[in-house]
Amino acid sequence: MFSLRNLPSLAPFVSAYASLTGYVMMIKPFLEMTIPPPLQNYMISYLNSFLHSTPSTLTLIIDDHIKNGMYNELYGAAQVYISTKVNHNAERLRISRDRSEKNVNIHFSVGEVVSDIYQGIEVKWRFCVDSNKSNMVHYFGEHFKLNPDRECVELSFEKKHTELVLNSYIPYVESKAKVINNERKILKMYSYCCMYLKWQSVNLEHPSTFDTMAMNEELKRSVMGDLDRFIRRKDFYKRVGKPWKRGYLLYGPPGTGKTSLVAAIANYLKFDIYDLQLASVREDADLRRLLLGTTNSSILLVEDIDCAVDLHTRLQPKTQDDTKGSSMLTLSGLLTCIDGLWSSCGDERIVIFTTTHKERLDPALLRPGRMDMHIHMGHCCFDVFKTLASNYLGLSHDDPHHLYPEIERLIKGEVLTPAQVAEELMKNEDPDVALEGLVKVLKRKRLELEKYDGETGRGGLRKPELQFFL
C-alpha cells in the first residue's frame, strides 16, 4: 500500500505546503475586507491573462497582383507549394483536370486552412477571394463597372518568428515551387482580356518541337544554339549592363511555320507565351501595364505586326483625327516598352514578332537590341520535305523512297510552302500514293511558276536567310 513512509523525501514538501495553506487561510479574510471587490476581480483577471496568455500572431497577405497590375510571382509560388500540402481530409476541396492530364488535381478551397511545419515552427496558409471590390474603368470611351475577384493567400504564424519566415521560409517556398514547376511544367498561353484589363491563360498544348519542326536543319541548329547561349548568359547581360532579353523577327509567306517555330521555342525553353494583340491595346499606358503583368522566363508574342494595328510612326505626321484623342498607341510607345527602361522590369524575356512583309516595318523596330535575330521562314526545301515525310508517313531518312530524287529536283525554289506539302502528305496514309500525288502537284506548280517567271522576268531562287545581331 502506498504511503508517505515509502517516500520519506516528500515529507518536507508536504509540511511546507500545509504551512502555506494555513497562512493563506489566515490572510484571506483580511484581504477580502481591505481590497474592494472590483479591484479583486481586476487582479484575478490580470493574473489569469498573464498565466494563460496566447502568443501574438502575424498574418501576411499575398495578393495575386500588386500595384500597377504587375503579377505577384510570390503568389504563384505560394499556390504551387500549397498544392503539395493539401489535406485530403478537409471539409471542402476544389478539383480540376486539364484535357492533357489523366489525374485529377486537388486544390484547397476558399477559407480552408493548410498547416505546415518549418524548422520546428508552425505556419498556416489560407486561401481567400474578395468579391466585394468594385471600381469604374474607362476604356475605349465607355465606362465599365467591374467586380473582379481579388485572390490572395494569407500566411499566419507567431510574431516572434517573423524574421525566420521572411528571410528563410519564404525563399524556401519559392525554391520548392520552382522545382515543382520544373517537374510538372504545364506551359500557359496568355491572352489579354479587355473587360477585366488583365491576362487570362489556357494550357499551351501545341505539340511542335525542334525534333518535329519542318525547318532547314542548318537554320534550326542556329536558332537552338542562339537560345542556349541566351539562357546561360545571365551574368554576361548583367556585366555589360543590358536587360536579359532577346528579340526574334520571324518573316516569310503564310504557311512557312512561323507559329510552329514559336511553339517549338516555348516547348524547348519551357517558357509561357503572352500573345499580345495590339489591336486590343488603346494607348501606350495600357501597353506598359500589360507588359508589367508578364512574368520572368516568358515569351512576348506579337503576330503579324505589320497589319495588327496602324501604328503611328515618327515618319508619319499626325492627322487631325490623331490629335483629337489625348493618347493613342504609338510605335514610339511600343519601342520604349521592348527596348527602353521598361524592358528592364524583368529577366529572361524573349520578344518575338512575326510578319509576312518585313519591308513594311519601320527600320527602328528591326535594329539590333530590339530584333536581335531575323529568321526567314521560306518555302519548303528538300530537307524540310524529308522531315515532313517522316512526321506524316513514317518514312526513315536512312531508307529514302524511290521518288525522293524526283521530288528533290522538283521542290527546289519557291514552289510550295511546308503547309502545302503537309496537306498533300495527309491525303493518303499509303506513302506511295501520297508521294505520287505530291509529285503531280509539284510538276503542275513548277509549270505555273515558269510561266509566271517568263512573263515577269523574275528569276533566281531564294535560300533560307538568317541574320544575327549579337
Swiss-Prot record:
InterPro entries with a match to the protein in the record: AAA+_ATPase (IPR003593), AAA_N_dom (IPR025753), ATPase_AAA_core (IPR003959), Mitochondrial_chaperone_BCS1 (IPR050747), P-loop_NTPase (IPR027417)
Cytoplasm listed as a keyword: no
Gene3D superfamilies (UniProt xref): 6.10.280.40, P-loop containing nucleotide triphosphate hydrolases
Catalytic activity: ATP + H2O = ADP + phosphate + H(+)
Signal sequence, renumbered to the chain: 1-18
SMART domains: AAA (SM00382)
Protein family: Belongs to the AAA ATPase family. BCS1 subfamily.
Protein name: AAA-ATPase At5g17730
Lineage: Eukaryota, Viridiplantae, Streptophyta, Embryophyta, Tracheophyta
